[in-house]
């Protein structure tokens, strides 16, 4: 193909030239290859041909070339020549090429031909438009041009300003509008979207300087700009909004106060409408009003005019982010006399040769807003949203925040955008714009607006943004209720609207729970704000009270009868009335219900305590609030308590009623009946469950079913937790009722006695119930006096029992009481234990959405061929923001392993709950086929990028390292046989290579041995691990194990370089980030050789003949003294046992001779009995938490709402295969050649990567993508040469296949849909800047992506390899890994089956 294209490009026939260029574009560039190879032929073709089509094709191909500046210098004369060409299409093709070859921009400037003046004033409008677009892209997206060529930049902006004023064709000056709008948006936004996200102060200052200069140039031409904007096509007219709005705001700020007052009432609105309708008198009245206002505010504005101009330019946020929706709206009661009145007036002014402007600094805002209001009827969504957002921005910046004539049409248009049917979009940009207007609205209009936008709030895709918007909305409602002294109450009517009633009945979505949480969080935020205000007032008046606290959840706030806190109390009652309806919801997301229960508990403590004190003072309103709250507790909580589906919420509700309702004086009549109802509920649902076959506990819920014992006669009863959180909470509720309610003493005492009689063998439950009974009903005179039981209660006889120290001999601790030393009283100990019970710190967890189950399957993070397996799972606790990590360590070989250490590291937003958490776990001795389990508690503060790292170190297996009488290696043959086949071929090659070297250079070795008698072996130099070969003089050429982590590199054991090489290979294995797949036994053998070499080198002065290479074959005595041993007594059969370990395919005499010598036994050397073994270190795979595995509610305390426009709303993903002689670096170079910014670059080893790229385009056409890739394990020759053929016949090991998942995101769904239709062409056209020896393709129809394999459900069958390659080390390792993984899965399946056989809960589940 290359030769054919090259011949056609160098042909003299124009048709062949065009054909060659077409082939180059279709079969080369479209396949992602770099056409730089044909650069010389293309330059020659441009210089010689006169054919227009050929030249245009050549310039389009030059955009894809990656040449050096010296090569580009050949093209500069041709570019300069053709820029002055008479052919417009050639000039346009060169202009489109210039941004892609900006590296030669310096040469173009030096030659004086980079002046865009003649181009932007060209006679052809297409050339002028292309020149403006090219100039804009050079000014914005080329950082070097902005910094280095200041004269070119200033000249370029002058040309853009000149075209926006002088250009007659709308299609052309629309490009100038776009460029200036982009500049104004760039200096207004908080984060830059251009030039690689460069947010430096220097760049902002330079852009602000040009923006100020452009504003001064265009201020006098506003009428002309407004007239020109109306002639632009309606689909592109949104690009003019930023320019007009920025200019109007700058003019208005620099001139002073406009004619309207700061607040509007009905009379002012009517007068304003009359003034606008009378066009003749309008200007005079406005000028008179303005003169008066300017005279009144002269002293305030004279000193600030210049500052207002600068601050207005630098601080405005007027960027218009457009959406992809359509609407038809009406302007409502807008102050427009006729839709075409601004157009006609401005046209007349433009035709009168600028005799007198109709716009003045006082009425220029009104003129622009009238024009914008007329555009709200447009059918283009981008224009509707842009002008609506601009009107709202002018309302906020021009001190006209109550002009309903502006607000109503915009609200109508925006709600029309939100309620369009058949349009799928992210409504957050429109809702954020509406949020800025909500504080300006009256109560009626606010209620109507909120009721209409609530369905759109539900459609926000991101949960965090949805909850944040709800919090801001409810904060506005509560704040307005407080500031209006209770006159504005929107909670009750808003909650009775149809949209919210339907939301509360929808069980499939979490929107109703988010509404409940947002109400509670917003009240907490407003309360915190007003408490700070009240405390400041009290401190100023020197009347500060220590009783007020800043927290809304635990403080004892005393409400006064007048003031803000009093009306906040009213709002809290309204919220609790709405929230208590949620306790009967059938939902696993009970965090919202828990928020509600705790909020009502806080409100009861505040209200009922204040109402009891106000009854003494005679205040009736506070007692009325207390009566209302008691009635709410009775009607919405007590009457519905049997219908609460969640045991956890039910127990909290009982605790709430025992604490507040039963102790209220107004509830004396119903005290005994209510307490009896609660005690029966506790007995039936929580207490009498343990070891009773007729009651069954299933998934946390109790089913009261009576079944025959014979059905479950063979099954052991369900073993529940001895003292779970339910037990503790139920006993605490009994304690509260027995302590505070005398009328139910007999019922409580009888219940405790039945517990003691029913569960005598459950020591925890028995001791806890006995402790409560003695505290409540034992006599003060004598604990052994049975007649006085129940007459004199120990606790009630004491006036204050807070100082009463308890006897811990009555109370067995639940687990270990962390704060036992600081708890000295009965109330403290019970409050602490109840807190542990309610919040789930002890016993079963009852707040999680995944009950009593691990949040994901067990994951094997160690290598399947490692002697120690580490299996990890976790359980989330959403109500606590914690995770419990379950780690199981298993010894899978037949030898015990000593001193196993597991180091745990945290990354991301994970943390240990307290500093003394042990992150290092030590196992002194791990027996064969035994498991050791432990748990690690973790705190979670955020959901992104969380992972746990594991590092495993252990000593050599005791069967190989300890000094025993016999070495018997037959025991581990069954476990390790599959591990060692991978090193057969390498060992054979190395031994044959060494044998040849020994035969050919025996004389040279003898000479070297004489020199080495006085020179010790440099073993210490090996620890650096920098060299792939052994650091010895003869350099035996051993293989480097770091080149292939799957192979066991072994050289001749007799050579002196073996120890250094093996130590470097072990260091590389220990430092690798992926799980080790090498054999543990080979590491053991290599480690013994290392120790032997180290001991021999340490004793080099005593034994000088040990470093002689020839001694390995000539003298057995030298070899024996040079190597340390694992056995003081030699075993004559050890060489036969080693055959099963090392491999049977090795030459038998050689392996016997070498291995026996390396493991021979010495008794002559006294230092051989002291053996130093360094532990084996394994770095396991990271245990990664996905964001959806946490299910943790957000913390809403002082929630900060980020007002930032979302950048992306649409997304689609696709899997791509990179196949050939490819690497991670070549893939990154391939993607870096795209015109996108690399915002994330993460490489994990040589086989995994994660990149992210983002664009810098404008006006809601933003685009980004992330790519995650992993290397696929291949088996040759099946996986080779399917879609790609090697051009150079390279070797098979260099051939790789990477599976990558692209995830594309864009703020425009239509853009993403059009991009999706050409994704296959885009993949094929990926550039190849460095190497083109690989292809990028989509998945084949029968091909499965690696990303779609989330778990292993069935045994994976290894592909059948070719006969000639069946014994390769790589194929053996793959087979061994798969076999071990299948063995691990079988083991897990057998465990699950045994659990099902003996678990009554599982049988009950299957039965139902």
Swiss-Prot record:
One of its GO terms (biological process) is intracellular protein transport. GO terms for cellular component: membrane coat. Residues 309-318 have a biased composition (Polar residues). Pfam families: Adaptin_N (PF01602). Transmembrane segments: none annotated. Signal peptide: none annotated. Residues 266-308, 319-347, 998-1051 have a biased composition (Low complexity). Residues 259-347, 998-1055, 1091-1139 are annotated as: Disordered. Belongs to the TPLATE family. PANTHER family: PROTEIN TPLATE, TSET COMPLEX MEMBER TSTA. Component of the TSET complex, a heterohexamer composed of tstA, tstB, tstC, tstD, tstE and tstF, which may act in plasma membrane turnover. tstA, tstB, tstC and tstD are likely to be the core complex members with tstE and tstF acting as associated scaffold proteins. This is TSET complex member tstA. It comes from Dictyostelium discoideum. The gene is tstA.
